[in-house]
């Protein structure tokens, strides 16, 4: 029965402490809102007084009723400003008292080594329990002593109980510090599962989400605790190293064979006026099948260019300084034709005799047909 009564009393005290804390939070919020309103009103009064003073300085020395009213208003505004300044100072002190309690101000540096005075007994049992627990934890884990690795991080709930939050993963980071510049360089980063055995070391940083231990690397001056910014920078560098390693292993440079295959699949035939494309030159096979051909060339498309001038077109296509030649193909016939003489009368008689002796010969129409059957002339450019 006594144990149950004690538990009930402690539970009631905790509820009272929580209610008191909420009441203080609400009071602090209301005082802060009032403080902001007073500051805005004080700023308005100061700017108004400055404007009125500037107007009074520009008026002539002869006083008038309007000037007297303005001076009276300035005096009233100054009194309001003084009262607002006092109210602001009082609210700031009250907020400090509500946030930090009725603790004494910080002692000077020369008295910092003196033992702390006995605290008043006005604090609630819940606060006393929390303070004593904090002191015990501080005595159990002094700075610089090794501590066993834990796979979970303790998180204190609002009710005051300690709840263990399981760790999702661990990261082992190997760093190297330059003694001259003091720069820290990350050598490697390895992700460990929570079930893997964690190496033992000295805890240098801890918060609600992560714990950092220093392993194998004791410096001459001992291990210094890390700040949150240093931990974030270290994690960022480790992520960069991990990404660079992943890129070097999974994303190698494209081999030449792949580039050649891509080049072979793309059409390489290009029609240019004056150049005849041969059938064997349209595509190039693999180097192993046709050793006589040259290896393919990778071409990069740089864009289109609209050219209207013929000279500019030749310049763009590389045909500016070329020589044009005409190729004429002559086929052999049954009776080669002799060139006609300058005077056709002398050769007409033998021709008629030969026609009477040998029979009919080729007519001009047949000659025309023979000329039409000849291949057409082709124009080529000699580069």
From Swiss-Prot:
Q: Name one Pfam family in it.
A: Paralemmin
- Which positions are cleaved off as the propeptide during maturation? 381-383
Q: Molecular function (GO) terms listed?
A: D3 dopamine receptor binding
**Covalent lipidation (S-farnesyl cysteine) residues?**
380
- Membrane topology type: Lipid-anchor
* Coiled coil region boundaries: 7-101
Q: Which residues carry this modification: Phosphoserine?
A: 116, 122, 124, 157, 161, 244, 345, 365
Residues carrying lipid (S-palmitoyl cysteine): 377, 379
Q: Where in the cell is it found?
A: Cell membrane; Cell projection, Filopodium membrane; Cell projection, Axon; Cell projection, Dendrite
Instruction: Provide the free-text tissue specificity comment from this protein's UniProt record.
Output: Expressed in neurons cells of neuropil-rich areas of the brain, in the Purkinje cells of the cerebellum, in cells of the cerebral cortex, hippocampus, brainstem nuclei and glial processes and sheaths. Expressed in the medulla of the adrenal chromaffin cells and renal duct cells (at protein level).
Query: Which processes are annotated in GO (biological process)?
Result: adenylate cyclase-inhibiting G protein-coupled receptor signaling pathway; cellular response to electrical stimulus; cytoskeleton organization; negative regulation of dopamine receptor signaling pathway; positive regulation of dendritic spine development; positive regulation of filopodium assembly; protein localization; protein localization to plasma membrane
UniProt keywords (A-Z) are: Acetylation, Cell membrane, Cell projection, Cell shape, Coiled coil, Lipoprotein, Membrane, Methylation, Palmitate, Phosphoprotein, Prenylation, Synapse
Positions carrying Phosphothreonine: 141, 145, 153, 242, 361-363, 367
Q: Which residues carry this modification: N-acetylmethionine?
A: 1
Q: Name the residue ranges with Polar residues bias.
A: 133-143, 357-367
Ranges of Basic and acidic residues composition bias in the record? 69-96, 257-273
What this protein is reported to do is described as: Involved in plasma membrane dynamics and cell process formation. Necessary for axonal and dendritic filopodia induction, for dendritic spine maturation and synapse formation in a palmitoylation-dependent manner.
Q: Spell out the family assignment given in the record's similarity comment.
A: Belongs to the paralemmin family.
Spell out the subunit comment: Interacts with dopamine receptor DRD3.
Q: What is the designated name of this protein?
A: Paralemmin-1
Taxonomic lineage of the native organism: Eukaryota, Metazoa, Chordata, Craniata, Vertebrata
Q: Which gene encodes it?
A: Palm
């Amino acid at each position: 029965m006594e144990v149950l009564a004690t538990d009930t009393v402690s539970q009631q005290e905790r509820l009272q402490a929580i209610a008191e804390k909420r009441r203080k939070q609400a009071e602090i919020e209301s005082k802060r809102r009032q403080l902001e309103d007073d500051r805005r009103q004080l700023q308005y009064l100061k700017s108004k007084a400055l404007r009125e003073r500037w107007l009074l300085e520009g008026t002539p020395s002869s006083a008038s009723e309007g000037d007297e009213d303005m001076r009276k208003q300035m005096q009233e505004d100054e009194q309001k400003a003084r009262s607002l300044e006092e109210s602001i100072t009082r609210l700031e002190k009250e907020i400090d008292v509500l946030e930090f309690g009725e603790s004494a101000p910080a002692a000077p540096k020369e008295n910092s080594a003196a033992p702390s005075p006995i605290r008043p007994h006005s604090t609630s049992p819940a606060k006393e329990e929390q303070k004593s627990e904090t002191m015990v934890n501080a005595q159990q884990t002094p700075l610089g002593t090794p501590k066993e690795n834990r796979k979970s991080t303790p998180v204190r709930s609002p009710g005051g109980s300690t709840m263990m939050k399981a760790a999702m993963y661990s990261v082992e980071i190997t760093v190297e510090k330059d003694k001259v510049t003091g720069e820290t360089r990350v050598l490697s980063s390895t992700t460990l599962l929570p079930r893997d055995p964690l190496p033992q070391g000295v805890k240098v940083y801890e918060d609600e989400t992560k714990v950092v231990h220093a392993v194998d690397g004791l410096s001459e001056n001992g291990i210094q605790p890390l700040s949150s910014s240093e931990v974030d920078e270290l994690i960022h560098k480790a992520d960069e190293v991990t990404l660079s390693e992943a890129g070097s292993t999974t994303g190698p440079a494209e081999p030449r064979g792949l580039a050649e295959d891509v080049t072979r699949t793309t059409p390489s035939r290009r029609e240019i006026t004056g150049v005849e494309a041969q059938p064997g030159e349209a595509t190039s096979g693999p180097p192993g099948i046709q050793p006589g051909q040259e290896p393919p060339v990778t071409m990069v498309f740089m864009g289109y260019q609209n050219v209207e001038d013929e000279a500019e077109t030749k310049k763009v296509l590389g045909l500016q300084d070329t020589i044009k030649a005409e190729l004429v193909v002559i086929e052999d016939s049954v009776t080669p034709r002799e060139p006609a003489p300058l005077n056709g009368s002398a050769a007409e008689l033998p021709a008629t005799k030969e026609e009477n002796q040998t029979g009919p010969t080729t007519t001009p129409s047949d000659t025309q047909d023979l000329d039409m059957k000849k291949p057409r002339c082709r124009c080529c450019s000699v580069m």
